[in-house]
Every structure is written in structure tokens, then in C-alpha cells.
């Protein structure tokens, strides 16, 4: 029998596929340093001294400010300055499933956080023995309600005519999948490794609130703080636009008020009679 010719099989090496770098996107499609959609309106409650409405992502929050007015109960009044009182409350229909209408411990904690963030911006010493009351009602919650509430409250305080050193803007950063992100949504807030809410006065370059939940390295915490401050600056511009839209005022022309400095006052020259 004739043998069939054998053909040698040569191994062909396929060229390796080039790995394309794909920009990392979050669950809602945003970039790591991108804010959610933001809308702020001032003067939305006719019976309040000042008010504001904010939509930050799917968060929908309304704020009313009453005062300065006489403090009740009177024994809680401070003789040298006003008392800033904040009340944060989530409507039963703001989350799914519905929550109890009774104030929770979280509501009380965020109320205290808001007061701490706003107090450094308000000239409380101008209204001794008075109260300034800030009421927050969350109509729909989507993560980051404390920061959104602070943003609305700052605009409402200005709308009430209360003198302030600067507007307070608030934003949170966090870490998810070992990446730092800006303005956490509800999913990122629950599934992330850490979060850092920050409140900031841009013109005065002062941080009025800094919290952190979770674990970050020192370098990550510094980067997260800088990222949050950049987010606050963007929110600050939206706050200004909301006030300019109502009052037609360009706040670039308004300089932040300085605190009393004795060395800035020049002594008047005494007359000759004063030396006699």
C-alpha cells in the first residue's frame, strides 16, 4: 500500500489583541468628578421669611426660614447672640418603603450637623436673645440629603435677609471600588467603602463641616477633601444664580464683611484743649 503524504502542521501564533483603555463610569453614567443635575430656586414659600427649593439628582427638598424672632422658650435665649435652630425631617413618602412620620435619631443627627455647618456663616451676634429657625422637609430622597439640605438652607437664609459672611455650599465625596467619586447617589452611598460630606465657604476659603464614614488612607482623605471643595465651588455658582435670578444682584460686587479689627481704626488727633 502506498503511504499517504504527511503534511506538517505549523503552529500559527495569533497576534495579541490590544487592550483599549475604557474611561471608568459610575452606575448612573457620570464621570468620577461629575455632579448630579442641580436646580435651586429661592423664595418659593410666601409665608416664610426666606425659603428655597432644591433638586439634586432625584433629591427634592424644600426649606423655610423664620426669623430673627423672639426666642421661645425664653430661658433658652442667649444674651449676646441669636440661636440658630435647624429641623430636618423626611416625609413618609420620600423613600420606598414608606417611613414613619415620627422624627428619627438620624433626623436629629442631621439637624445638629446642619446647625454646625451654617452657624459659622451667620452673624448671630447681631440678634441677641432671638432665634432663627430653619425647617427642612425632604420630599424625595436619593442619597446625600444632608448636603442638599445645607445648600438649600444657605440660600433660604439669604432670602430671609439674614446677614451672612458667605454662602455655605456642601458636597460629599466617597470611595467605591477603590476609586474616589464626587456627589454620591443612593446606590453609591449604600454600597461604597466610605463617604466624606464637606461644607465650605468659597469666598472665605473655610470648611465649616467635615465628616467621614468608612476607611481612607491619609492621601485618599486629602484627595477626597480637595475633590469635595471643587464640587462645593460648582454648587456655589448655582446658589448665586438662584439669588441673582430673584433679586438681580451680582454678588461679585459684594465683598465679604470683615470682623472687627481694632488695629484698623486710626486714632483721631487730639485738639490743643485736650492737652490742657
What is each of the regions a protein language model found here?
Residues 2-276:
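Polyanion-binding surfaces on beta-sheet-dominated domains and ring/shell assemblies
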Amino acid at each position: 500500500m502506498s503511504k499517504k503524504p504527511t503534511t506538517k502542521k505549523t503552529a500559527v501564533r495569533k497576534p495579541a489583541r490590544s487592550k483599549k483603555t475604557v474611561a471608568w463610569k459610575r452606575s448612573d453614567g457620570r464621570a468620577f468628578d461629575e455632579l448630579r443635575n442641580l436646580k435651586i430656586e429661592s423664595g418659593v414659600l410666601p409665608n416664610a421669611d426666606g425659603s428655597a427649593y432644591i433638586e439634586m439628582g432625584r433629591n427634592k427638598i424644600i426649606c423655610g426660614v423664620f426669623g430673627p424672632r423672639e426666642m421661645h422658650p425664653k430661658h433658652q435665649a442667649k444674651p449676646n447672640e441669636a440661636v440658630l435652630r435647624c429641623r430636618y425631617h423626611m416625609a413618609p413618602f420620600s423613600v420606598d418603603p414608606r417611613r414613619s412620620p415620627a422624627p428619627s435619631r438620624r433626623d436629629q443627627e442631621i439637624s445638629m450637623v446642619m446647625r454646625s455647618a451654617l452657624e459659622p456663616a451667620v452673624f448671630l451676634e447681631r440678634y441677641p436673645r432671638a432665634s432663627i429657625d430653619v425647617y427642612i422637609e425632604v420630599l424625595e430622597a436619593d442619597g446625600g440629603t444632608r448636603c442638599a439640605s445645607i445648600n438649600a438652607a444657605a440660600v433660604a437664609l439669604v432670602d430671609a435677609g439674614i446677614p451672612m459672611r458667605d454662602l455655605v455650599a456642601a458636597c460629599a465625596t466617597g470611595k467605591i471600588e477603590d476609586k474616589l467619586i464626587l456627589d454620591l447617589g443612593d446606590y453609591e452611598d449604600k454600597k461604597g467603602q466610605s463617604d466624606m460630606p464637606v461644607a465650605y465657604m468659597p469666598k472665605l476659603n473655610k470648611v465649616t463641616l467635615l465628616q467621614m464614614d468608612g476607611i481612607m488612607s491619609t492621601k485618599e482623605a486629602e484627595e477626597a477633601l480637595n475633590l469635595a471643595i471643587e464640587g462645593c465651588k460648582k454648587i456655589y455658582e448655582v446658589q448665586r444664580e438662584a439669588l441673582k435670578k430673584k433679586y438681580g444682584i451680582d454678588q461679585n460686587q459684594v465683598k465679604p464683611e470683615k470682623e472687627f479689627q481694632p488695629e484698623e481704626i486710626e486714632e483721631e488727633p487730639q485738639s490743643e484743649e485736650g492737652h490742657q
